[in-house]
Amino acid sequence: MPIGKKRTDSHIIGEIGVNILKSKLPVEWVTREYHPDYGIDLSVEIFERKELCVTKGAHLFIQVKTSEEFERFNLRILNRSNVELPPQVVKKAEYCMEVIRYNLDTDFLFTVERMGSGVPVLLCLVEVKTQEVFFVCLSDYIEKILIHDKNYISQKSKTVYVPTENILDENGFEILEWYAKRPRLYALFNKIHYQNNVLQHVDQYELTKYIDHFIRIIRRFDVWEEPLYISYMKQAESEIDYYLEHGITELEDKNIKSKQDSGEDVDSEIWEATYCNPNREVSFREAQKVQGLHRLWTQLSDLGDYFEDMCKEWFLPTALWNMIKDS
């Protein structure tokens, strides 16, 4: 005889997992569940509390998997060369990380891959027994680990290893926010790349006008003050602010002052310099200013390269991340 619609145990434990995850997040953050979902269970919008809760305009996507208890084991990790470059011989090294393994359908992983690493998708493993949540960025995991397995696409499922040190607590909130702000980081890198190309065709007489315009554009990007960002980026921020205050880059300003302190002439046009008009000589002051601005934009352009090489391996079960966090 009919007994009515049934609710499966998997649906119940899945709902429990989502509720535990929500309870771990800051109360001002907004979560939105997807029904039906096709791999992505919910999205998170980051807010900050001031006098009112204000959105930061940062979002990330989450796939939630729940179990009463996850088995932990120590994963042996071997050193490897940079996966963004052709294989190279590297110094042998070995690391060990405690991880939780979880099998995911390759169809879902391929969907995440198609979304691109500019839209971070996190896998969150919720353990009911301990009420703990562990996470890993699937977008980076696929790019830095999975696609370098020749058999990845041909398999029905793939094992993903989630480091147990990636736990959702107050420190974890900073990491989630770092992932959520990735699209604006990419927007910054793209803008700098465009500006740097333009500057290659600007002569020394127009350079300051272009720089004054460009530098105010990139300084407005809401990416510079985040605590997790690389020290290289903090250095770039400091360089930008020094220029905005003094009208010259810091290193070149020191070079000019050093020459002046030693009694040398910095204003006579007796120098030939890179990036300056090859048909006339310039002053040491002018040469330093022009070269400093090009140096600054080269430094800014390197931010995106560093991010691709290093930062997208943060919090992954890789040798590079172990080297970075232990340094």
Task: Please tell me what each predicted stretch does.
Residues 1-6:
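A short, surface-exposed helix-loop junction/capping segment
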Residues 7-11:
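A detector for short, charged/polar N-terminal pre-domain segments
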Residues 13-82:
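Catalytic centers of nucleases
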Residues 89-186:
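Mixed-charge intrinsically disordered linker/loop segments at interdomain junctions
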Residues 177-327:
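Long, low-complexity, intrinsically disordered terminal regions
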